[in-house]
Amino acid sequence: AEKGNGAYLNQRRIHVSEISNLWQSYVFYCEGGEKDRLRTGSILSKVYPEVIDLRKLGSAGLETAWVAAGKGEAYFTTRIEPWDVAPGVLLVQEAGGEVTDFVGNPWKLETSDLLFSNGGVHATMLNLLW
């Protein structure tokens, strides 16, 4: 991905999915360590009944790439470091998706709770994250 020039996989342009209903969505997640397990568990208990499935791959790079390529509709993470997600922010945005904090503010380096999505499910996901 290059800012302003789209996102590509093997020289083919990629795009986020067009799904706009959460109940048709796959959602990836990652908790920011042991301190956030209860908080993440609380979020998962709200999200899981609303989606096809929750997935945890263990790699912010892989999870954001899957959202960018339309293989999932959203990814949320708590207490993550900027170097773990900065490439994924660009990738998802260039593929047509959205990246915000859990309130809906745009990503900044100091943002540690993040939601990446295809845009179509973003508002619904934000409502579930709080």
What are these regions (language model features)?
Residues 1-2, 109:
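Generic beta-strand structural signal
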Residues 2-8:
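DPxDG-like acidic metal-binding loop motif
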Residues 14-130:
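An extended, acidic
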